[in-house]
């Protein structure tokens, strides 16, 4: 039997809950045979798939080493922990949860420091006055170095943070920080604020593929099935299915509906009996229903879609293109 296809997912907390819910909505149920404490699982209906439950940072490491084919982790951890990330992994799809911004934050008392250019001036003056470099507390050493280098800032030193980074300036262990934030409330509570141009990265949980994994034909087929489910669910979220029947419908009317409401006719124009099926963005449903009735439709029904499978799978095409590079 060939080596298993490995999908690495978060092992605890909200990230695990959101990840399992995401795959469940796509028709891919993750399960643990040994119960909640088990760190290995399966996907119902997919043979030879091993679900590895790991910390988000461990997932990035496994992807980097080719020990997982696909993994769910934050882009911040990918960029921080994987050198030349764009060559070694591919961010296949943002998953819409796990949002966090990696930012440069300074004490609110620094009223004259609004930008990275201001910070550059302050770091130079700080070194001249105190005969030491300004300290930046962070867990994101590589992202910080790259961002500061891009802004020409050199008079600083990094203090690697083991605990709550936002408390470092108040504790006297650093002058400023680079950290993640979602609302900014924790930064504000610790007397910090984000520089106007201090956004290093807007991160979210991503489905990430590893170049160095064993992409056998069987592994590629497993990835195709998984990504087909995810793409079908994503398409379904974009539309509602609209059904109606009226003989007055023609190509010109469909063209107008497409241009005005963004609808698609996935099965072509109306049948000989006038039956018509359209896919419509949710925000345009009432406008479309009114338009159809104005042109002769007696009844217009709307149903939600679970999946919309197309011949083309953009997610798998993205993976294949990445592996060919």
Curated annotation (Swiss-Prot):
Enzyme Commission (EC) number: 2.4.2.17
Reaction(s) the record says it catalyses: 1-(5-phospho-beta-D-ribosyl)-ATP + diphosphate = 5-phospho-alpha-D-ribose 1-diphosphate + ATP
Gene Ontology cellular component annotations, sorted alphabetically: cytoplasm
Activation and inhibition: Feedback inhibited by histidine.
Function according to Swiss-Prot or TrEMBL: Catalyzes the condensation of ATP and 5-phosphoribose 1-diphosphate to form N'-(5'-phosphoribosyl)-ATP (PR-ATP). Has a crucial role in the pathway because the rate of histidine biosynthesis seems to be controlled primarily by regulation of HisG enzymatic activity.
NCBIfam families: hisG
The name this protein goes by in its record: ATP phosphoribosyltransferase
Species of provenance: Bradyrhizobium diazoefficiens (strain JCM 10833 / BCRC 13528 / IAM 13628 / NBRC 14792 / USDA 110)
Gene name of this polypeptide: hisG
């Amino acid at each position: 039997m060939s080596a298993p296809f490995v999908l690495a997912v978060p092992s605890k907390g909200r990230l695990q809950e959101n990840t399992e819910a995401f795959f469940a909505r796509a028709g891919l149920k993750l399960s643990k045979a040994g119960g909640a404490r088990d760190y290995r699982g399966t996907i119902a209906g997919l043979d030879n798939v091993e679900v590895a439950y790991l910390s988000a940072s461990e997932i990035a490491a496994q992807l980097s080493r080719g020990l997982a084919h696909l993994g769910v982790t934050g882009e911040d951890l990918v960029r921080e922990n994987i050198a030349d990330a764009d060559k070694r992994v591919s961010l296949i799809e943002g998953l819409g949860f796990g949002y966090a911004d990696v930012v440069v934050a300074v004490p609110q008392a620094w009223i004259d420091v609004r930008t990275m250019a201001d910070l550059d001036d302050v770091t130079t003056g700080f070194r001249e006055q105190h005969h030491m470099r300004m300290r930046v507390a962070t867990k994101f050493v590589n992202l910080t170095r790259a961002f500061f280098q891009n802004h020409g800032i050199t008079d600083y030193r990094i203090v690697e943070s083991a605990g709550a980074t936002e408390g470092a300036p108040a504790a006297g262990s650093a002058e400023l920080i680079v950290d993640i934030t979602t609302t900014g409330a924790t930064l504000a509570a610790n007397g910090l604020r984000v520089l106007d141009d201090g956004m290093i990265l807007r991160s979210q949980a991503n489905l990430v593929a590893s170049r160095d994994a064993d992409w056998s034909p069987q592994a590629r087929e497993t990835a195709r099935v998984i990504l087909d489910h995810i793409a079908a669910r994503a398409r379904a979220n974009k539309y509602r299915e609209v059904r109606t029947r009226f003989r007055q419908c023609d190509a010109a009317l469909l063209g107008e509906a497409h241009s005005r409401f963004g609808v698609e006719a996935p099965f072509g124009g109306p049948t000989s009996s006038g039956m018509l099926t359209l896919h419509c963005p949710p925000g345009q449903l009432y406008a479309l229903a009114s338009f159809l009735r104005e042109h002769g439709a007696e009844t217009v029904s709307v149903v939600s879609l679970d999946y919309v499978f197309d011949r083309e799978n953009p997610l798998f095409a993205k993976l294949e293109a990445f592996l060919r590079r």
